[in-house]
Structure formats: structure tokens, C-alpha cells
Amino acid sequence: IDNDYGIHFYLKGLAYQDKRYFYESIKHFKLSGDLFSVRLPLDQLREMGEDEQILDLLAL
């Protein structure tokens, strides 16, 4: 179910262009163990200009 929430918040982040939803998406993808999909919100945050070091830490 965490993977479903990850997708939900990722799509919500795309719709609203709101960083909070991308961070929530990362949390749920990590809880589900889906290390492939976690890159989707990370890439969006990178495009939005988020700090590269923070994003690298979140990718671990």
C-alpha cells in the first residue's frame, strides 16, 4: 500500500507542482522498498532546484 501512496503523492506533486507532495512520495516509496520509483520524485525535485546534497542523501 505504501507504493500506491508513493504514486499518489508523486502524481499530486506533478499536478500541483508542490515540493511537499514529492517529499511525501519519497517517504512512501522508501517504506515500500521501491528504490526504482523513488527516483521519479527525486528527479522532479532536482528540476525544481532543490539542494543536490539533500537529494543525494534521500536517494540512499
PLM regions with names:
Residues I1-L60:
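C-terminal non-catalytic interaction modules
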